[in-house]
Amino acid sequence: DKNKVESLPEELRHIFFDMCVNQGKSRGVKILQRAANAKGAGLKVDGGLGPKTIAAISESNVELDRVRAYRVKYYADLVTRKPDLEKFYFGWYKRALEV
């Protein structure tokens, strides 16, 4: 498992895999790290899925809805930086909430 999907809590595996495919592994990990930090994990947001990140995500009980919210924020920030991508935002938003 190149992306270490199996090392994550079961309820986050599908969305993490989808983030790896659509946003790249590093960005997907950063979203998980930010979601864990919102619950007090204190992780460095570096995009690396090492033992500290895996443990913190499990121990902080990161909820799927929290990950979805951070994923939506990523897309909103991307469109703010690159307004020409706004035409894709609604589809990205829907996907972020449905996966």
What are these regions (language model features)?
Residues 1-2:
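Amphipathic alpha-helical coiled-coil/leucine-zipper-like oligomerization segments
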Residues 60-99:
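Low-complexity, Gly/Ser/Thr/Pro-rich intrinsically disordered linker/tail segments
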Residues 5-17, 21-69:
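Short acidic, glycine/serine/threonine-rich helix-capping segments at coil-helix boundaries
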